[in-house]
Amino acid sequence: MSIKSGFVALAGKPNVGKSTFINAVMGRKVVIVSDKPQTTRNRINCIYTDKDSQIIFVDTPGIHKPLHRLGEYMVKAAVQALKGVDLVLFMLDAADGFTKTDEHVAKIVNDSGTKTIIAVNKIDVAGEEKAKAVGELAKSMVENVVSVHYISALKGEGVFEVLEKIKEELPEGPQYYPEDMVTDRPLSFMAAEIIREKIFHLTRQEVPHSTAVVIEEIKDRPNGVLYIRANIYVERDSQKGILIGKNGSMIKKIGTLAREELEFLVGRKVYLDLNVKVKEKWREKDFIILQEIGLKDDIK
């Protein structure tokens, strides 16, 4: 039996709602979200499967003007994700209006030459008139647009219609992944992302963006507990102090929230061992960015 299947890359500036859209489609949290820009650093394949289709959503870092080497690699990963896919889902933020960054992303999307669906997000915040103005501007800059949609990813409004349009545009093809698989990323990656999400939720200003989480060890203990040891890298001693908190209060809070979500993910008890370490200017160092964080897998 043939199904509709293929790869759909999400493109847009930071904090436009790409990860929220994917989680809404999946009906569960697969990728981390926060209200801060540049939460997503790596390219992540999220796999949606139903009785007549399999859609592999390629969630990418937001395209922005990079301020450091990490940012350069993030943008490179996002741009490269648009190549070799069946569709691009170009997302915009209605509340922001059509910005210079949106214009930059539109040019990149247009240059990819790939069939494009435009989704203007946050219509519940901006209102229909402002959202439609954004959608029309975006459409005027991208040649290969097949449809424009106005949605609220957070509330799930319009998400089903976008999903149905994606299915309509995808070719018939094979089932690429088992039907119970929701991402192609390993547990170590998911664990690091969950820890990083809690840091984004609980800290402010430059601290979350200056943080890298590296899983050093995952092993089963004889008592059935899953042991996970992670290093959290920051760039300055002051950031380390904030992450640890008074009498260890902040790192304990991060650890508790991350552990609870990890236990839900793996379905058993987890012992989470977190260590905060200083690596000065790690965002400028290729080895950490490419090897430790894993962006080398996103850049061909």
Swiss-Prot record:
GO terms for molecular function: GTP binding; GTPase activity; ribosomal small subunit binding; rRNA binding; small ribosomal subunit rRNA binding. GTP binds at residues 12-19, 59-63, 121-124. The keyword Nucleotide-binding applies. InterPro entries: G_ERA_dom, GTP-bd, GTPase_Era-like, KH_dom-like_a/b, KH_dom_type_2, KH_sf_prok-type, P-loop_NTPase, Small_GTP-bd. Pfam families: KH_2, MMR_HSR1. It is a peripheral membrane protein. Residues 121-124 are annotated as: G4. Coiled coil: none annotated. Residues 12-19 are annotated as: G1. Residues 38-42 are annotated as: G2. Residues 195-280 form the KH type-2 domain. It is found in: Cytoplasm; Cell inner membrane. Residues 4-172 form the Era-type G domain. GO terms for biological process: ribosomal small subunit assembly. The keyword Ribonucleoprotein does not apply. Transmembrane segments: none annotated. GO terms for cellular component: cytosol; plasma membrane. Belongs to the TRAFAC class TrmE-Era-EngA-EngB-Septin-like GTPase superfamily. Era GTPase family. Monomer. This is GTPase Era.
